[in-house]
Amino acid sequence: MKHLLSTEDLSLANAIRILDTAEEMAAVGDREVKKLPALRGRTVVNLFFEDSTRTRISFEAAAKRLSADVINFAAKGSSVSKGESLKDTAQTLAAMGADAVVIRHWASGAPHRLAATDWIDAAVINAGDGTHEHPTQALLDAFTMRRHWARLHGTPSAGADLKGMRVAIAGDVLHSRVARSNVWLLRTLGAEVTLVAPPTLLPIGVGQWPCSVSYDMDETLAKGVDAVVMLRVQGERMNASFFPTTREYSRRWGFDDNRLRALDSLGLKDTIIMHPGPMNRGLEISSAAADSPRSTVLAQVRNGVSVRMAALYLLLSGDTREPALTPNAAYSTKESH
C-alpha cells in the first residue's frame, strides 16, 4: 500500500490489515508512555485546504505518537491564499523532505491528483476531498463497529470482518464524503448497509452503490439494525432548500428521543449510535441520544488516533505487498444475526 486515497479500491486483506494494526496501536495508547519510535526521523505534513480541527489534531497526535516530525500547513494566510497552485505547494513540501502528506481539500479528486503526479515522492493520505471520500473516518468507524461486533460474539476482533452486521447510515448523504467511504468499506467487510435520507439529500446514481436505500427512518429501525451512523447536516454546502424546516427534518430523519426509546421497545438492546462529528445537536441527533450509553462518539475519536497511527505506520514502513488474508476463523463461523 503506497497511498490511502479511497475505500472503494481498498481490498479486504488491506482493510483488515489496517484494522488489525490499529488494534496494536490502541494497546500503545493504554500504556503510561503512549509513544513508539517507529517513524523517528520521518516528516508528516498536514496539508489542509479546508478547516478541520478534529481531523488535523487526530493525525498530528497519531504522527507524534509514532515519533514523526509534524508540519501543519493551513491554506488560510499561506501562499495558497495568494494564488500558489497545488503543484507549487507540493514541490515546496518535497524540497523540505516530506515523507507523507495528509491532505484535506475542497476539490474532489485533489489527493488522487497529488498521488498520481511526480510533484512529490511521498505517501498521500486523503483526509477528505470535497464530497468524495474520507477513508480514515470510514476505517475508524469500521474499527469501532468491529470491536462492538466482536464483543457481542465473544470473539477477538483481530482478523475479523463484519459479515452479518446491519448498518444504517442516515442523513445528509448527498454532501457526505463519510457516507461514500463507509458504504464501500463496510460492504468490503461484509456488512449490510442501508442509506436513510430524504430524496433531496441522496446523490444521483446512488442506486448503483452497493447498498439499499430507504426514505423512512422508523421503518429501517423496525427491520433491525446493529449500528446507526448519523450524518451531519452540512448547511455550509447547501445553497438551496433541501428540506422544509429543521424541525421537520429532525422529526422525520433525525435520531431523536423517541427513536432512542424505540430501540428498547424493538428489542434492539445492543444497537450502537454513531456520529463522525461535529454534531448538530437537536437536528440530526438529540442530546439524549448523543450522550446515551449506546453512543460511540467519544470512542470514535479515540479510535481515530489508533487507525491513523496504523495508516501512517503501514504507508511509511516500506512494505507495499498485498497481505495474505487470514480471517478470524472462530469469528467467521459464528452464525450472523
UniProtKB/Swiss-Prot annotation:
GO terms for molecular function: amino acid binding; aspartate carbamoyltransferase activity. Coiled coil: none annotated. L-aspartate binds at residues 82, 177, 232. Its EC number is 2.1.3.2. The keyword Repressor does not apply. It catalyses: carbamoyl phosphate + L-aspartate = N-carbamoyl-L-aspartate + phosphate + H(+). GO terms for biological process: 'de novo' pyrimidine nucleobase biosynthetic process; 'de novo' UMP biosynthetic process; amino acid metabolic process. Keywords: Pyrimidine biosynthesis, Transferase. It comes from the Bacteria. GO terms for cellular component: cytosol. Pfam families: OTCace, OTCace_N. Pathway: Pyrimidine metabolism; UMP biosynthesis via de novo pathway; (S)-dihydroorotate from bicarbonate: step 2/3. Carbamoyl phosphate binds at residues 54-55, 104, 134, 137, 277-278. The keyword Nucleotidyltransferase does not apply. HAMAP family: Asp_carb_tr. Belongs to the aspartate/ornithine carbamoyltransferase superfamily. ATCase family. Heterododecamer (2C3:3R2) of six catalytic PyrB chains organized as two trimers (C3), and six regulatory PyrI chains organized as three dimers (R2). Catalyzes the condensation of carbamoyl phosphate and aspartate to form carbamoyl aspartate and inorganic phosphate, the committed step in the de novo pyrimidine nucleotide biosynthesis pathway. This is Aspartate carbamoyltransferase catalytic subunit. The gene is pyrB.
